[in-house]
A protein has these predicted regions:
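Gly/Ser/Thr-rich phosphate-binding loop
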Residues: 6-73, 86
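Conserved ATP-binding/catalytic segment of the ANL
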Residues: 102-174, 183
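Proline-centered flexible-loop/turn and helix-kink motifs
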Residues: 40, 83, 185-186
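Adenylate-forming AMP-binding core of the ANL superfamily, especially NRPS adenylation
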Residues: 26, 47, 57-61, 65-126
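Conserved C-terminal "lid"/linker of ANL adenylate-forming enzymes
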Residues: 165, 189-194, 204-205, 222-277
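C-terminal boundary motif of the adenylate-forming
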Residues: 144-146, 180-210, 234-235
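Short, conserved charged micro-motifs
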Residues: 212-221
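Active-site and channel-lining beta-strand-loop segments
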Residues: 86-96, 145, 241-247
Length: 277
């Protein structure tokens, strides 16, 4: 709506908004500020949750800006849990049959949620239900998201558990790295993926540039990316268009990007990523 509001009548309509909610994927504060300019009378919220349990947490733009001053590289702050919801950060263990151990404040792990309004289960999908609701009671829901709780009790989302890059130096989450590069370069979309075996994966940064050729980035761009983040970067690549979920334009298909990046680094024939499926 905001992107298409080019006429005076549409802009006046947006000016009458009182509350705006944006959810479904990590929302950059820059995006919220742009919407705020079009709807100056609205309070902007980014509630966090999922189909199985919503809401889990909530935050408005003013609180996001305060959180980002405290930690500009923490990921996406989605606020404190709403009344009645409990959030736990647990070890990432895809094979756990019981609730994984809880981690200390500030530690990155999988986000687990308990609330009276969590859905009852999954109809006929027993393996999914066992994985999502571990333990004999099954009252904790494994979100599949990763993040951390800070000292103020705020929840930060850092990406998906399946997208964590397991390097020899430790795990690297996708969202904080991508946001740091996007801000430094002033670009709309970046993908951080891992190439190689789990435990010794190499971090590869793929920058979306409509004018670039799919393949290795130029030396200046690569240097700018490496200056933007503290993690060692094995390679910087560019693509004309990053592949996204057919239903959600904000959700990059990192599995496809990682496979393509592996081919590039292995010296195989570089194909157009947007047509790679």
């Amino acid at each position: 709506v905001a992107a298409s509001a080019r006429t005076t009548s549409k802009l006046l309509g947006l000016a009458g908004l009182r509350v705006v909610f944006s959810a479904g994927a990590p929302v950059a504060s820059e995006t919220l500020r742009a919407i705020s300019e079009l709807a100056p009378g609205a309070t902007l919220h980014t509630p966090y949750g999922m189909t199985e349990v919503l809401p889990v947490a909530d935050i408005d733009l003013a609180a996001i800006e305060l959180a980002e001053r405290d930690d500009p590289n923490g990921g996406v702050c989605v606020g404190r849990p709403v009344v009645g919801a409990e959030v736990r950060i647990a070890e990432i263990d895809f094979d756990a049959e019981d609730v994984p151990p809880e981690l200390a404040t500030g530690s990155m792990g999988e986000i687990l949620i308990r609330a009276p309004w969590v859905s009852d289960g999954y109809l006929g999908v027993w393996a999914t239900e066992r994985a999502a609701r571990p333990g004999p009671v099954g009252d904790w829901h494994r979100s599949g998201d990763v993040g951390h709780l800070d000292a103020e009790g705020r929840l930060w989302v850092e990406g998906r558990a399946v997208h964590v890059i397991h390097t020899a130096a430790g795990p690297v989450t996708s969202v904080p790295v991508e946001r740091a590069v996007e801000r430094a370069l002033g670009v709309a979309r970046v993908a951080a993926v891992g190439v190689g075996p789990v435990g010794s994966q190499q971090l590869v940064i793929v920058v979306e540039d409509r004018d670039a050729t799919d393949g290795p980035a130029g030396s200046d761009l690569a240097a700018s990316v490496r200056q933007a983040i503290s993690e060692p970067v094995a390679s910087v690549l560019t693509v004309g268009r990053l592949p996204v979920d057919i239903r959600h334009n904000a959700k990059i298909d990192r599995a496809v990007v990682a496979s393509w990046a592996g081919d590039v680094l292995a010296g195989r024939r570089v194909r157009n990523l947007s047509r790679w499926r």
